[in-house]
Amino acid sequence: VAGVIAGAVVSQADAATPGAHHSPQAAAKHVLLLSVDGLHQSDLTWYVARHPQSALARLVGGGTEYTHAHTTTPSDSFPGMVGQFTGGDPGVTGVYYDDTWSRALLPAGTTNCKTAKPGVELDLTEDLDKNKNSIDAGQGLSGLPNSILKMTGNPNALIDPTKLPVDPKTCKPLYPYDLLRVNTVFSVIRQAGLRTAWSDKHAAYDILDGKSGSDIQDLFTPEINSAAIGYPAGDDWTQDNAATEQYDSYKVRAVLNEIDGYDHSRSSHVGTPAIFGMNFQSVSTAQKLPSSEGLTGGYTAKGVPGPLLQKNLAYVDTEVGALLAELAKQHLAGSTTVILSAKHGQSPTDPAALNRIDDGPLLDGLNAAWKKAHPSYQGDLVAHAVDDDGMLIWLSDHSQQAAAFAKKYLLAQSGFGTDINKNKRPFTRSGLTKVYAGAAAAGYFHTKAGDPNVPDIFGISQYGVVYTGGTGKIAEHGGAHADDLAVPLVIYGAGAEAGTRVSKHVETTSIAPTILTLLGLDPAKLQAVRTEHTPVLDVR
């Protein structure tokens, strides 16, 4: 395998799964993956330069840092995380966003599948929860939120099957893990008899569970978009940065328990997982919120973190330090590789560039223009759209002609958005620089035009554009700007050489085969790796 990991590591005190088999070529017995969502490589560089004794500086200085790493396009949480665990981009995995459309599946609740018309929203958000207003997603725990660690490690039990799309072949609901087209590192690691765990923000992250629906033995998914207990009514855990930090801290506690050899709830001693970790959400909210805790959010100038983001970077650093300290305490530092990255970045990092555009009137106008040109057409042209700082649109007419019509219309629209100070700011071309339509959109994602999940329209926005109907956020992700894509990638610990910087371009999809290689497993067992020839990272 290209990029073979350097050196084997002598086993230290270890709570591995009984009977588990590690290859003698394995550099590590455990891989701890940390995704700091929203974090840019530039943020990491900025923080480490000013805090040379920090935990983040320890990772960078003591490991291999890839300074030109990019996440997936679209730069959304779901394709970003799926890419890190499969080695595949959206065109291969079929996962383009957390809220998309399928032309092949049937609407939720369909019982007569022979006559039902295909076409359904694929919603991988809190909307699938049995109770999206509760941090336990409807499990019914008492004493929340402090009792949240008692939440099940099998979150697909908390998904409401009546909300799921229906398979036209079997006429049965499809869970998120049924929608993923390829296998995951969890699948390969389980097949090797090793333990798996992960922690994320929605029950729908059971998409990572693989075709078996159970490849992650301990999946802890407190609902981030539930009502934030102890905060103003109507707020979820993302609308106050202190709440987001509190929420992230529950997941840190889960990972600390796993380092200690327990499951996330600390109720069963099962051994430290071979693959485990979590995502941090608090950097992302510190970038998106105009203000929180009396501090200004986002950036004060291009790439310069403002006071809220600085505070949050320090929070993440403290939590990373706690995880590293626990690994050392359990004598696992020498047998564990820590990987730091992010599902996505955030744009813009220049507050002066911000232009918030309401996409609602643009989509309404497109539907009206299509109706005027095609008066006998039934329904709206736009079947589904998701617009953050990019534009993804699925059309009810999947023809190239309809896609071309939509592209022409969007590129002809002008109007006014709002800048960082809430003043009017003009826009042209619907805030877009380029639009891929129909076959061109499929080509952009390296898939066939017949892919039932690929958007008919993929619009790349002008720098600084955020599609939102209000002024409640100052940044977003999902697009294809450097601010969306340029995330950190640091590999530290077992098998990684200290103080190494790699400046060549790499993709975060390479994390998946690298995890397997570190554990002494065959990265070619990943279907997406075989399809895309995803390289293993050269940890020198």
Regions found by a protein language model. Give the residues of each.
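Secretory targeting and sorting signals
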Residues: 1-15
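Active-site-proximal N-terminal segment of extracellular/periplasmic enzymes that hydrolyze or transfer
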Residues: 16-64
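A long, amphipathic alpha-helix that forms part
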Residues: 26, 245, 249-256, 260-267, ...
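Beta-strand elements within well-structured catalytic alpha/beta cores of enzymes
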Residues: 28-41, 58-60, 84, 189, ...
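Short, structured active-site-proximal loop/turn typified by the sulfatase FGly-forming signature C/S-X-P-X-R
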Residues: 44-94, 195-197
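Secreted, luminal/periplasmic, and some membrane-associated catalytic domains
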Residues: 51, 67, 74-76, 95-142, ...
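Active-site His/acidic residue clusters
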Residues: 202-203, 207-225, 263-316, 352-354
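Substrate-binding rim/cap in mid-to-C-terminal beta-strand-loop elements of soluble/periplasmic
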Residues: 361-411, 476-519, 535-540
